[in-house]
């Protein structure tokens, strides 16, 4: 099963450099902290609608593959992050199978828990980069994060109801 927001997320085109944008827009797009937490700061109840979760092969992650180690399988999680039931963000997380060891095995068991609630409680979290993307008037971003030095790629598309707009 897919969702139109995830199709648009995969269509994001990324800027080579951080574009000169309104400071409020950049504040959202370059946020280093948890987007879940930022949404909750808007006074909203945040929930996850699961679209897809499971192992995939390289041919299912062509956009992410150049940014991750080449492996036989990857854990893919596609969700809508909702605020008071309204979708504000589409998220796609790709995790190499080699990342799924030790405490990071929990990435497979998040269920309806927002990824940010797990990631931003880890003292081993680092971020390699944030890239800003755009498609058809919507903004997004992708980040390569590391847990205990092990990579994962998170792509987020801000949906029209999001306070980013």
UniProtKB/Swiss-Prot annotation:
**What is the enzyme's main class?**
lyase
Q: Where in the cell is it found?
A: Cytoplasm
Which InterPro entries does this one have? Chorismate--pyruvate_lyase, Chorismate_lyase_/UTRA_dom_sf
Reaction equations catalysed:
chorismate = 4-hydroxybenzoate + pyruvate
Q: What is its EC number?
A: 4.1.3.40
Q: Which Pfam families match?
A: Chor_lyase
Single GO biological process annotation from the record: pyruvate biosynthetic process
Give the UniProt keywords, A-Z: Cytoplasm, Lyase, Pyruvate, Ubiquinone biosynthesis
Q: Which residues bind substrate?
A: 35, 77, 115, 156
The principal localisation class reads cytoplasm
The Gene Ontology CC terms held by the record are: cytosol
Q: State the function annotated in the UniProt record.
A: Removes the pyruvyl group from chorismate, with concomitant aromatization of the ring, to provide 4-hydroxybenzoate (4HB) for the ubiquinone pathway.
Similarity section: Belongs to the UbiC family.
Protein name, as recorded:
Chorismate pyruvate-lyase
Which lineage is the organism of this entry classified under, starting from the top rank?
A: Bacteria, Pseudomonadati, Pseudomonadota, Gammaproteobacteria, Enterobacterales
Primary gene name: ubiC
């Amino acid at each position: 099963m897919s969702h139109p927001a995830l199709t648009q997320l995969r269509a994001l085109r990324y800027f080579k450099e951080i574009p000169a944008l309104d400071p409020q827009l950049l504040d959202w797009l370059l946020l280093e902290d948890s987007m879940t937490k930022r949404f909750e700061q808007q006074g909203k109840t945040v929930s996850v609608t699961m679209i897809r979760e499971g192992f995939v092969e390289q041919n299912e992650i062509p956009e992410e593959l150049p940014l991750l180690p080449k492996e036989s399988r990857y854990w893919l999680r596609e969700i809508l992050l909702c605020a008071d039931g309204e979708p504000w963000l589409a998220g796609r997380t790709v995790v190499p199978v080699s990342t799924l060891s030790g405490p990071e095995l929990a990435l497979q068991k998040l269920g309806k828990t927002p990824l940010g609630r797990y990631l931003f409680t880890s003292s081993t979290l680092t971020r390699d980069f944030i890239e800003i993307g755009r498609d058809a008037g919507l903004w997004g971003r992708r980040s390569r994060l590391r847990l205990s030095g092990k990579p994962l790629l998170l792509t987020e598309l801000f949906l029209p109801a999001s306070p980013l707009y």
